[in-house]
């Protein structure tokens, strides 16, 4: 689960999942040790315990993990208003001037959780594009809906 550790390090979080970590295909889970032992005995798995996220080159956190990280002290966070939050959830990037406040140093290459009030909408990486500084959207809560819409259009 090196990818999970890399993700947590990138956003400045010191998070240790309670339970045993399980890899099922590209998905990463955590389950109680007793449950994990029973799961392993069953053979072929599809889902096991609580989803942390999936790995496709890099770790993509699940909504549950983002929710947990949002409640913690320590991870880098930026807060946006409702309009910017909606655009971010639709896959758009955040301009630096749209950030209302932040926890963590706003330096290029740093990853931040994007917050709307107490809710985490996803995360991004601070980048420069010419004269502008943006928070590049890496993952947002609208990802699932966009993937589902793509499946519907392909039917």
What label would you give each PLM region?
Residues 1-155:
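Polybasic, low-complexity RNA-engagement segments
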């Amino acid at each position: 689960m090196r990818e999970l550790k890399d993700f947590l390090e990138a956003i400045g979080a010191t998070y240790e999942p309670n339970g045993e970590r399980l890899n099922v295909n590209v998905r990463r889970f955590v389950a109680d040790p007793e449950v994990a032992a029973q799961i392993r005995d069953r053979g072929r798995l599809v889902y096991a315990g609580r989803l942390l996220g999936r790995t496709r080159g890099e770790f993509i956190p699940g909504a549950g993990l983002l929710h947990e990280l949002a409640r913690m002290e320590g991870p880098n966070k930026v807060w946006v208003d409702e309009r910017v939050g909606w655009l971010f959830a639709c896959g758009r990037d955040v301009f630096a001037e749209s950030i209302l406040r932040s926890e963590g140093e706003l330096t290029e290459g740093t990853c931040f959780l994007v917050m709307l009030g107490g809710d985490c909408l996803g995360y991004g990486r601070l980048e420069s594009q010419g004269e502008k500084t943006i928070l590049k959207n890496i993952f947002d809560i609208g990802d699932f809906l966009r993937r589902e819409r793509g499946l519907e259009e392909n039917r």
